[in-house]
């Protein structure tokens, strides 16, 4: 049975969906004011694997991942570049789609944008005002009153009294409490705005996600996810406003992905230590990046380094070598039940991908020993749930080399062939040895000599 670590209760719990066989999952997507970095990729890959696994277990998953396309950062960036907000967001949505496609991240079933749900957002704010959970502040903003929700802090387990006492005094001038947050921002000159019962304005970030999640999945759903940095205040605020409006639990399970770090610090645009997905893809195969991102449990911090990416590459090479000579899968090919069960046990333990990867390596060892097509197909199938081992083995094993390097290898193979024709075995053996020392393995066959990269 699947067990998930629920941030709300701080413990692993058996997963029971609201509707048998069906799962509603909402994940906070990106704010499109810049290119996605590898920290975004970690979250997207983690939830991609969760969806793939749940579907492999027979669940009908409705996966929603939003796009925040109106925000202070977007407005500021568009102004800096002297472009329209629509032009800016379209550019980065296209870039995100290119990144996710390259990383073999499945598209969500629904990808709502905040600007497409203004009426839904306004209706939700009206409900909160009617229930006395929100108020119109002196400056014309509509704010949520945190003190009206006694359970505020139940997700992040923050010391709310401490947060209030540590807040800046000037915020209180516009809000009844420093922790109150904006649901609707009064329009400012030159900023995009929409008509509302409270005048022209635009939605706050937190209310956008609640409104879009409810629109796509209903007032209650199974899983809400996002990065650990969103737990407070974003997800805390989502719970407060959603449950105040409906009187029902918002999401039953809250899953949070740990931070990707660089030298012990969170990778973030604000710090300036981030690597864009596009830049990392220039240097590393997409499957290598996926493997690296899954090499640590999704809740644990993961350190970015070239060494860790190299280790991921070596690991994938070993897996590809195990399946490189396997005949194509046929319609009646069956998967090995024992290894399926071992893999499922790992994934049922809160999507424990490091243990699942160790199962794949044990299976690869058995494939190498037995050369069993059934085991090899099982290996490819299980790895496919993690989103890799899906390329042509020869193509992958030759990837990562510049065309000039490939030409040099082909030239050396030709020289070796000539040496063998001249019965100069010493030279032929030396060429093989030299290439092997560079991580290039030669294989002689009836149709000629082929080569592949190997784990050094």
Swiss-Prot record:
Residues involved in ATP binding: 269
UniProt keyword Nucleus, yes or no: no
GO biological process, one term: cysteinyl-tRNA aminoacylation
Keywords: Aminoacyl-tRNA synthetase, ATP-binding, Cytoplasm, Ligase, Metal-binding, Nucleotide-binding, Protein biosynthesis, Zinc
Domain of life: Bacteria
Cofactor(s) the protein requires to work: Zn(2+)
Matches recorded under InterPro entries: Cys-tRNA-ligase, Cys-tRNA-synt_Ia_DALR, Cys-tRNA/MSH_ligase, CysS_C, Rossmann-like_a/b/a_fold, tRNA-synt_1_cat_dom, tRNAsynth_Ia_anticodon-bd
Subunit text: Monomer.
Protein name according to UniProt: Cysteine--tRNA ligase
Annotated organism of origin: Legionella pneumophila (strain Corby)
